[in-house]
């Protein structure tokens, strides 16, 4: 049961590492810094991640409601695992947000 949660975290870490490697491999050129090129992929990835987190939370909530209603196909173990996965995804998103805000504050306080 806990193994599936850990594998989810490991897959998320692998995705994050792949994004970091891709960002490090790209050389910044003036054409790469246009707003549409620079923010399009990041914004799309951020929106996709938020959508996945929202879907996981909704699915976990629906499964919890089904368990409360006594649906025989839904076990307590599955409900608890899905709720923990949704919670972990949300906590990860909050940490990413906190780091983005900290980076923004640091950049905005730099003198030109």
UniProtKB/Swiss-Prot annotation:
The keyword Methyltransferase belongs to this UniProt entry's keyword annotation: no
Major place of residence: other
Keywords assigned by UniProt, alphabetized: Bacterial flagellum
Gene Ontology terms for molecular function: cytoskeletal motor activity; structural molecule activity
GO-annotated biological processes: bacterial-type flagellum-dependent cell motility
Compartments where found: Bacterial flagellum basal body
Gene Ontology CC: one annotated term: bacterial-type flagellum basal body
Entry keyword annotation includes Metal-binding: no
NCBIfam families: fliE
PANTHER family attached to this UniProt entry: FLAGELLAR HOOK-BASAL BODY COMPLEX PROTEIN FLIE, PTHR34653
Family: Belongs to the FliE family.
Protein name: Flagellar hook-basal body complex protein FliE
Gene: fliE
């Amino acid at each position: 049961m806990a193994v599936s949660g850990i594998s989810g975290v490991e897959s998320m870490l692998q995705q994050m590492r792949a994004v970091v490697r891709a960002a490090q491999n790209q050389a910044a050129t003036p054409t790469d810094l246009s707003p549409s090129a620079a923010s399009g992929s990041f914004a799309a990835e951020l929106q996709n991640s938020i959508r996945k987190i929202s879907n996981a939370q909704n699915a976990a909530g629906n499964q919890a409601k089904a368990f409360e209603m006594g649906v025989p196909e839904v076990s307590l173990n599955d409900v608890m695992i899905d709720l923990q996965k949704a919670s972990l995804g949300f906590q990860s998103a909050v940490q990413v947000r906190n780091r983005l805000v900290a980076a923004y504050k640091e950049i905005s306080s730099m003198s030109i």
